[in-house]
């Protein structure tokens, strides 16, 4: 069964746009929590946020953007989103290379938060509305996204109480699930 948010619920996902929007809200909450965190909470909170952001970007790149590119026929918009993801990966690597006692740690997390916030605004204001009107089977795509995300969360140990065991991997190397084609129904 596909989870509705990054591991905290087992609700079924309504559609791809809803799933990604929920991820965006969760990431915003994590960045806000970082800003209010105690010194002891900074490292684990930043690590969890980076892991979830990597997973979110990966499912968008593997499944969502290919469908969005075909549906919108707007290569420039998707190319820009992918460039922003590449920049975010560099910012994530910078955060992950530091600990909270590093002088630039909070600034690096703040830069990542600003970058992610700008990207989210762009997706939610331009890309998501276009996909809603493009005739894409967003429910089937949402199921594919949720299944892939769940696999990645499990691989990183983010569904378990022990996050740090398998979670030290920087990149998850599993074959991507195939995104449903436009109009294709996904079997149960």
State the predicted function of each range:
Residues 1-188:
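Small-residue-biased structural context
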């Amino acid at each position: 069964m596909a989870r509705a948010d990054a591991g905290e619920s087992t609700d079924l996902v309504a559609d791809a746009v809803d799933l990604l929007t929920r991820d965006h809200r969760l990431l915003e909450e994590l960045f806000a929590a970082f800003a209010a965190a105690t010194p002891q909470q900074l490292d684990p909170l930043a690590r969890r946020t980076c892991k979830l952001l990597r997973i979110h970007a990966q499912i968008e790149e593997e499944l969502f953007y290919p469908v969005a590119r075909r549906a919108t026929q707007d290569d420039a918009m998707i190319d820009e989103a992918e460039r922003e993801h590449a920049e975010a990966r560099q910012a994530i690597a910078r955060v992950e290379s530091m600990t909270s006692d590093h002088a630039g740690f909070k600034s690096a997390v703040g830069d990542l938060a600003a970058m992610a916030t700008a990207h989210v605004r762009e997706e939610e204001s331009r890309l998501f509305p276009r996909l809603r009107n493009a005739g894409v089977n967003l429910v089937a795509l949402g199921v594919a996204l949720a299944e892939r995300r769940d696999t990645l969360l499990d691989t990183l140990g983010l569904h378990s109480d022990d996050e740090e065991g398998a979670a030290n991997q920087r990149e998850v190397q599993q074959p991507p699930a195939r995104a449903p084609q436009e109009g294709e129904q996904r079997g149960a």
